[in-house]
Amino acid sequence: MKKITGIVKLQLPAGKATPAPPVGPALGQYGANIMEFTKAFNAQTADKGDAIIPVEITIFADRSFTFITKTPPMSYLIRKAAGLSKGSATPNKAKVGKLNWEQVLEIAKTKMPDLNAGSLEAAANTVAGTARSMGVTIEGAPNA
């Protein structure tokens, strides 16, 4: 077991990581090979379009590293499905978009590996709650 010197969590655009900030300074302070990471990350996420991908990089004492990519943030998936550039500044007053229940289930399926929900139904309710907090109304929800 190699000794871990640091764990860095970043959110990067898929296939477009560069050694510039935030990647360079975050990895540079641990002495990890920045170019090696950006090449590996870009190769692994090239098929994800322009999504923002959270990544957790574990850096070891010998300056080697491993990284785990996660699914895009829920807010990004909701904005994309509803066709929004950003959520509502006042979600309880101003509604900025609509999602139907099928879209909510689709987002829940995408996020399922990263959620601690026991079922797709529970994951869908989590997605619906996040959408409501962004000022997006949900249509056709079974329990709404």
Swiss-Prot record:
Cellular component GO terms, alphabetical: cytosolic large ribosomal subunit
One GO biological process term: translation
GO MF terms held by the record: large ribosomal subunit rRNA binding; structural constituent of ribosome
Keywords: Methylation, Ribonucleoprotein, Ribosomal protein, RNA-binding, rRNA-binding
InterPro entries with a match to the protein in the record: Ribosomal_uL11, Ribosomal_uL11_bac-typ, Ribosomal_uL11_C, Ribosomal_uL11_C_sf, Ribosomal_uL11_CS, Ribosomal_uL11_N, Ribosomal_uL11_N_sf
Entries under Pfam families matching the protein: Ribosomal_L11, Ribosomal_L11_N
Transmembrane segments: none
Post-translational modification: One or more lysine residues are methylated.
Protein task: Forms part of the ribosomal stalk which helps the ribosome interact with GTP-bound translation factors.
Family (UniProt): Belongs to the universal ribosomal protein uL11 family.
Subunit annotation: Part of the ribosomal stalk of the 50S ribosomal subunit. Interacts with L10 and the large rRNA to form the base of the stalk. L10 forms an elongated spine to which L12 dimers bind in a sequential fashion forming a multimeric L10(L12)X complex.
Name this polypeptide is given: Large ribosomal subunit protein uL11
Species assigned in the record: Deinococcus deserti (strain DSM 17065 / CIP 109153 / LMG 22923 / VCD115)
